[in-house]
């Protein structure tokens, strides 16, 4: 009897130990989380800051060692150096926000010494990663594999989360027209797939709202050719606002500065991107400039993935996958991975309210409203006249 009791007690003691392990036997306490910034800092009020805050909150709450590392400069080599530094320091979950980490993943994912490290990349698409396997000609077109024995792939120690940008772009365009704006602009950074999806979604949303209101809308459309603002881009924005553009969706890193500078001078408006940019834009350029922001759920994607890997032990569900995140809840818009902000969007009674937004999200979730993610051609529209101006640089 005593022997049986001892066996039962021993088995019971194993239960919490097993619960703290993932499927490979790694215990929660064995994990250390590092975040590498792309080329900004954790105060950028965008990708880096949001990812940092999600990592820190999760790790603090679960008593997990966490540190962030900032590369010395904006290059793949400098980002790889920080990844290596973090791993040398014992960090075995590496979180990397932004498409700029595609080259980093390409260089580290197949290293034998990193096979047990888990790389979590946000907004690194299949296009971004697989493009690194190729040589390119002077036009940027692919010109054959760098190594014929190393074909494009994603390794089992990598998970990438990407987003349905066309959906939150649609929401932003729909909201802008519903709020009464009929002269719009889209200023993209570089014409990479994510930015194009934002832009084409914006066009589709504006057209849908214009149809409902039986209005005609004009929309200027251009790419800056870079992810930062400068005098040349600001000059184009000055021209747009000067000729009647009311609000510009500035989509691409720091390129919003050119739109916001021009908007401030002309009394115009802007729409932010990726995160709720109202605080940073309004804080620098004037209260009320930001109409809304087309947001990606960087925070929940980071937090949820860390929980799934560390607490739930479900890395096998993520390993070697590139997963596209979008709408997951038709009843609570704040739980989705793509959305516009409830707090800072300039909702207006009789035009576009929080209830109107909730209905839009519900209809999108239920499939009553569909949005194309085709990036090969400008969407077909009926009530929006698009002036596609190509690119500035």
Q: PLM features: what roles do these ranges have?
A:
Residues 1-32, 389-393:
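Short, low-complexity disordered leader/linker segments with a strong preference
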Residues 25-393:
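A residue-level marker of the well-folded mature domains of exported/periplasmic proteins
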């Amino acid at each position: 009897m005593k022997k049986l009791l001892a066996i039962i007690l021993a088995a019971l003691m194993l239960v919490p130990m097993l619960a703290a392990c993932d499927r490979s036997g790694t215990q929660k306490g064995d994990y250390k989380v590092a975040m590498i910034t792309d080329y900004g800092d954790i105060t950028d009020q965008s990708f880096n800051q949001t990812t940092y805050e999600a990592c820190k909150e999760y790790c603090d709450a679960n008593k997990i060692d966490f540190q962030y590392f900032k590369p010395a400069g904006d290059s793949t080599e400098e980002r790889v150096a920080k990844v290596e530094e973090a791993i040398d320091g014992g960090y075995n979950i590496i979180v990397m926000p932004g498409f700029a980490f595609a080259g980093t993943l390409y260089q580290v994912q197949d290293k034998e010494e990193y096979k047990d490290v888990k790389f979590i990349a946000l907004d690194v698409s299949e296009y971004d990663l697989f493009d690194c396997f190729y040589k390119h000609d002077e036009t940027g077109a692919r010109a054959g594999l760098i190594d014929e024995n190393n074909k494009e792939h994603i390794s089992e120690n990598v998970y990438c989360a990407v987003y349905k940008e066309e959906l939150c772009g649609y929401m932003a365009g729909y909201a802008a027209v519903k709020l009464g704006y009929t002269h719009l602009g889209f200023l993209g950074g570089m014409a990479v797939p994510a930015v194009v999806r934002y832009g084409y979604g914006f066009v589709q949303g504006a057209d849908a709202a214009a149809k409902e209101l039986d209005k005609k809308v004009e929309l200027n459309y251009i790419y800056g050719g870079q992810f930062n603002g400068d005098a040349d881009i600001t000059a184009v924005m000055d021209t747009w606002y000067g000729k009647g553009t009311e609000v510009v969706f500035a989509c691409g890193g720091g390129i919003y500065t050119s739109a916001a500078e021009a908007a401030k001078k002309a009394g115009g408006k802007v729409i932010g991107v990726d995160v709720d940019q109202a605080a940073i834009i309004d804080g620098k350029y004037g209260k009320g400039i930001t109409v809304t922001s087309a947001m990606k759920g960087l925070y929940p994607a980071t937090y949820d993935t860390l929980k799934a890997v560390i607490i739930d032990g479900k890395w096998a569900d993520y390993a070697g996958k590139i997963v596209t995140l979008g709408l997951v809840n038709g009843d609570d818009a704040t739980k989705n991975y793509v959305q516009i902000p409830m707090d800072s969007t300039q909702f207006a009674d009789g035009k576009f309210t929080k209830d109107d937004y909730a209905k839009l999200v519900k209809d999108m979730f239920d499939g009553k409203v569909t949005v194309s993610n085709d990036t090969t051609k400008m969407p077909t529209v009926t009530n929006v006249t698009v002036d596609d101006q190509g690119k500035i640089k």
